[in-house]
Amino acid sequence: MKINKYKITAVLFLVIIFWIGTVTLWNNRTEFKNMLHSGDVINETNKIYSENVAYSDTFIDMWSKTQSVTDVQLLDDAEYGNIIKDEKGNLYFPANDVDVTSLAENTINFAKMLSEKNIKFAYVQAPNKDLKGYTDKIVSDYNFSNKNADEFLSILDENGVDTLDLRELIIKENLDREKLFYKTDHHWTTTTAFWAYNKLVEYLNQTYNLNIDPNNYYRDINNYNLTEIKECYLGSLGRRVGKSVSGLDDYTFIEPNFKTDYKIYNGVTSKTNPIFKGNFHKAIVKDNILTSNDVTSNKHATYFEWDYGDLIIKNTLIDNDVKILLIKDSYSLPLAAFLSTCISELDMVDLRDTPKVDLQKKIADGDFDVVLVLYNTEVFNETMFGFDIK
């Protein structure tokens, strides 16, 4: 008699789900008793189960591992539908095919407005894990981020907007694509961010004659301390499928070995009282994340910790008077940390934050040399491109 592994798997998981439900009910019996008197049985039940379900981490691990055993490359996920796993073990979010026309028009109008104020503008396209010529076809079948980015950049180029496509430089320089991204997270590694920081400064100097770091001192990796921490990081994707399926990533911490001094302000709350100050480590690095033994701690956020709505970073030891406004997503956290070492002021704005920053006022008051928008290929939505042109 031939054993059907799929039927056995289904039966086992029905038994496990029943057991988990029973244990959760018993562990939260007091909450359920109170819920019966609350008048909102359905919502309260959902809340209790979602917040207190027994063995949740173990269940995620077991379910994902079972899918791997049954040769599934699309791992179930409640929020995204599927998490994609390629043959190299990399995990990916899916990304929809987006009509980027209106987003490109917003960006073109934003660039025109800045030009009228004699402020330079460039759109910088950060890569996504779905890399041309490297990623398995199954990823491109479910992730349209590169297609969206290609169409977006094409419209900008046709309208004379300055762009820097880091994806093309990865191909041109034949970088080791195994080391560009974390396997378990959607972000680039710190070493990739450092490379991108170098390319960005080169571009700014060549395109706008800013003369940033003319001696290449602050961009020389030999002037930084690198500390590699082995198997310490379970990223955003790995947390969704379980570490038994994804494994753990190594993390490389990079910080200057030269003298630094900063004053950092939260532009939303106070532009006069710094929230952080001191050298690079004291002002920018978050030891609670860096030294945490919890593998789910977000190592990517070791620099700055949060995606602040408006963060003003002043380097008191640099006197080149270069001021840059960086409109960003979370990819920019490590890159911005490195960029801050070689310019007088770097302001970071994240349009996802609420209350939303008044960009027009910030630009009018800021006296910026350059405004940059630096996004990865998966953020083509109205929020990220809502520049509020007036």
Give the predicted meaning of each segment.
Residues 1-390:
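Extracellular glycan-modifying ectodomains
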